[in-house]
Every structure is written in structure tokens, then in C-alpha cells.
């Protein structure tokens, strides 16, 4: 288990460092830039040039006490404030993070702005220029329902590390008050704060499991944790797999309609027979 603290500004980084020195601090911290400076300013309260200089100082201080710093890039596929952004600029921001010493990069769609084709295009660009897959983390919010599709698109481009939350919790930002997500700083640009969270880890892991991808996660235990999270929060969360569980792998007797075997026998059909006896074994249809 790696404990990560989100530390947007230097004061928070300093508190994390103090905690590490006292024996309780995080193993890893996160700072974030947005390619759209309006979005960045709304999130951090400062300019991009000033923030980059601050981040460089923080990386150096964190390294001195053994804390790794994750550099996050946001508004890669567009900004809810300024609109369209350029993928090429996000690749440049990624390089800048690594150049000043970030341990890894979170490529984030915090606002659900990424269509799957652009996700594949972006990560193909990134891996073409920075091929070490250990450096890249995909982070998709499900504001428009594209989360698992985007995970698949990123996987097809070559990404191997993904982030998710139980029940798809999170938002702008992912704050909790009395165990309930609350709105972030400033005007709230979503219509419903309950439908903006990070990709549901349950849905993502169930999908990967069905694709025979070994995640190393106990899928049934994960689904139980998701159910427990719903009880903790006190409402239905945004994981379809919590509700519907895994795809069945064996006959479910309780859902059978009675009488199939008797009807096949009455019609003179063999068990397992699926076509009339006078049909050829293979179809000759050629399109």
C-alpha cells in the first residue's frame, strides 16, 4: 500500500514533509497543472509559471525526506472553463514534469471531456515520446459516462496503470464532509455533484477480468467493498457492477424457465441441438 496525499500548493507539501519527518506522513504526494491556465488558476490560485517554479522547489524538498511527487496534467482533452485544448501541449507538460523530477505522471480527465478516440490518440503520442509505461497513470472521470470506454482506449494505446474509486466517488474536487462529497471552490460547473466522480474501480476491474486481464485484485472482495461503501455513504453509487456483480459463468438454476427438456423431447430434438436436422452443419453464407 502506498499512501498518497493531494498537495496542490507548497504549504500542503510542507505539512506532508513535516508528517514524514514525524513518522506519519505520506509516501507520495501529488501536485497538479492544467494546460488551460484559467482552469489552473481556479484550482490553485496562481499562474502556471509561478506554479511550475513552486513545484520544482517542492519536488526537491520532498526527495530530501524520501517522498515521491506525482505530477498531474489536467484539461488534456478540454476545459470546462475555456473549452478546447491541445493534446500536444499536454505532452509538453508531461515532459516538463519529468524534467523537474516528478516520479510519475497522472494524465487526468477531471471533467469527463475525453472521447475514447482522442484518449487513444493522446496516449499513443505520449508513449511514442516517453515509452516507459511505469511513468504513466490514466485517470478518467465519468461525467458523461465514458469511463470504461476510455480505460479500454488507453489500454489499446499501451497504458497499464489506471486509477479508480469505489463507487465512482469524487468530483470538483474530491472533498468529503461528514462522509458526503461536497462542491469545490468557486462556481460549480456541474449540474449534479453526485455524477462527476472518478471511474468506478469495480466496473473497470470487472471489465478487465472479463477480458482475461489479471489485475491481481480479488474481484468478488472488491464488489463487497463497493457495497459496503454504498452503505457508508448512504446512497446508490455509480458502479453498475456493484449492483449486477460479475457475468455468470455457470447455469443459474433459479432463472431457468421450466419445460425446455420436455419440449425438445416432444419435438424429437436432441439435447444441445440448435438447428433443424435438415440444415447443413455449417452455414454457406458468404456475404
Describe the residue ranges of each PLM region:
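Catalytic cores and adjacent flexible loops of soluble metabolic enzymes
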Residues: 1-287
